[in-house]
């Protein structure tokens, strides 16, 4: 790679953020560097970024940070100030779980409750990119299957930070232990899926119910034409109010809602249904989504 000062720094790009202390992030980064050609970008002296590169095709930037991802509130402004404006931010990251499940995941960020222990602000949601989440998760599913990887490919619910971002952002992750974070096959699958990302418009839903791994929403995302923006699991529905639902709709472009009904308490269904009715958003059942938005044969 040669050092090149970008000729048009005002041109927004899909920007992949890789964190130095994150093993999965470094794994994905190494594959990104090998899968396509990049040119180094000169950073201003005041920039806190470690390095920045742009793909030769001009579609992506790859930016290195020394901190962890979740506390990167205001990152879009920092990128802009460094002459690296982003149209979409993809955080290449590790996923950790107590169950230590082999996993490839995507999700958007936000703090539905009044707490923000892992970055972001309480009761604030980030702008999501349902199209990017659908594209990357579908790519992960396809490529992991071709490699016969024993990984769960799943959509996670909205959680942690950063939330203070004015451009869309998503996480693309490898989980859930050091063994998987450094797995070269998983790193390759994640990197290829990111580089193949499509931002083609898709029908968007906001999801309610289910667990942290939104299994029913994952099935609908992978098996129909729709995608999801924000998803709220059953254990956080008590925090859902009109302001939060309004945020979820406005920051994802949601056109309708989906309930994982059996997982939801009746009082939560009633409360959220009334909010959605007030906002003019209909609730579609799984059967209706599959009928109206089924994949073409």
Swiss-Prot record:
<comment type="function">
    <text>D-aminoacyl-tRNA deacylase with broad substrate specificity. By recycling D-aminoacyl-tRNA to D-amino acids and free tRNA molecules, this enzyme counteracts the toxicity associated with the formation of D-aminoacyl-tRNA entities in vivo.</text>
</comment>
<dbReference type="Pfam" id="PF04414">
    <property type="entry name" value="tRNA_deacylase"/>
</dbReference>
<dbReference type="GO" id="GO:0051499">
    <property type="term" value="F:D-aminoacyl-tRNA deacylase activity"/>
</dbReference>
<protein>
    <recommendedName>
        <fullName>D-aminoacyl-tRNA deacylase</fullName>
        <ecNumber>3.1.1.96</ecNumber>
    </recommendedName>
</protein>
<comment type="subunit">
    <text>Monomer.</text>
</comment>
<dbReference type="GO" id="GO:0008270">
    <property type="term" value="F:zinc ion binding"/>
</dbReference>
<keyword id="KW-0378">Hydrolase</keyword>
<dbReference type="InterPro" id="IPR018033">
    <property type="entry name" value="Deacylase_DtdA_archaea"/>
</dbReference>
<dbReference type="GO" id="GO:0019478">
    <property type="term" value="P:D-amino acid catabolic process"/>
</dbReference>
<keyword id="KW-0479">Metal-binding</keyword>
<keyword id="KW-0862">Zinc</keyword>
<comment type="similarity">
    <text>Belongs to the DtdA deacylase family.</text>
</comment>
<dbReference type="InterPro" id="IPR007508">
    <property type="entry name" value="DtdA"/>
</dbReference>
């Amino acid at each position: 790679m040669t050092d090149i000062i970008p000729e048009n720094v005002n041109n927004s790009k899909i920007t992949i953020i890789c964190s130095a202390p994150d093993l999965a992030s470094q794994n994905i980064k190494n594959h990104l560097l090998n899968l396509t050609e990049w040119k180094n970008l000169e950073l201003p002296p005041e920039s806190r970024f470690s390095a920045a590169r742009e793909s030769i095709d001009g579609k992506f930037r790859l930016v290195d940070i020394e901190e962890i991802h979740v506390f990167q509130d205001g990152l879009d402004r920092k990128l802009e100030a460094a002459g690296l404006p982003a149209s979409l931010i993809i955080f290449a990251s590790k996923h950790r779980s107590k169950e230590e499940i082999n996993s490839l995941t995507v999700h958007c960020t936000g703090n539905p409750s009044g707490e923000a222990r892992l970055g972001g602000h309480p009761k604030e949601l980030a702008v999501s990119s349902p199209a990017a989440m659908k594209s990357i998760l579908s790519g992960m599913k396809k490529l992991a299957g071709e490699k016969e990887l024993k990984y769960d490919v799943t959509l996670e619910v909205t959680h942690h930070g950063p939330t203070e971002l004015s451009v869309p952002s998503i996480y693309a992750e490898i989980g859930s232990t050091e063994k998987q974070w450094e797995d070269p096959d998983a790193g390759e699958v994640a990197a290829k899926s990111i580089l193949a990302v499509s931002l083609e418009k898709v029908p968007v839903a906001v999801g309610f119910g289910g667990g942290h791994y939104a299994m029913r929403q994952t099935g609908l995302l992978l098996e129909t034409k729709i995608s999801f923006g924000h998803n709220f699991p059953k254990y956080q529905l008590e925090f859902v109010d009109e302001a939060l639902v309004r945020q979820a709709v406005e920051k994802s472009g949601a056109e309708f809602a989906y309930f994982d009904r059996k997982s939801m308490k009746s009082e939560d269904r009633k409360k959220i249904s009334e909010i959605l009715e007030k906002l003019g958003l209909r609730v579609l059942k799984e059967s209706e989504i599959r009928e109206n938005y089924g994949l073409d044969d």
